Amino acid sequence: MKITKIFVAILALCAFAACEPNNGNNGGGGVDDVWSDNGSPVGEWVLTEWNSSKDLPFGVYLQLNEDNTFDLYQHTSSVLWVHYTGTYSLNGTTLSGVYSDGESWATSYTIKYSKVAEPKQILLTSPDNKGIYTATTIPDAVIDQATEAVVVRSGESKRFL
């Protein structure tokens, strides 16, 4: 009986010693425990978290294609979906882009990839913002109802990226 108690105490001590501190990240260590620098941004994405908020008053879908072109569908200041196109480049972990009218994205983003298989996610951070995008299929209704950016009134055309 005494040996059993000692054995249980040793096991508990070993388990306690193996634990890492939380560091305020919901059960994990730092950001590198969840995100990796290795991955591919190619795919269809929906913005699911913006600056730590999951309750978004706007919608953003982003399609990054293998040929370094992108399609951005957004409704930010109206209920209209607006469609933008352009090209993007990935230099290490820096993602930047240029709209088809020649205007650059508002900023470049550091990109990281989720380490978990499902749901597949990417994290885009800039000096002022952090967005988490989750892999999805862009709904046909969004694509079909989107207004091309060139015909949108200027008050509704503030670009998300």
Residues covered by each model-derived region:
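C-terminal motif of bacterial Sec signal peptides marking the signal peptidase cleavage site
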Residues: 15-18
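Lipid interaction determinants
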Residues: 21-84, 94-161
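Positively charged n-region of N-terminal signal peptides that target proteins for export
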Residues: 1-5
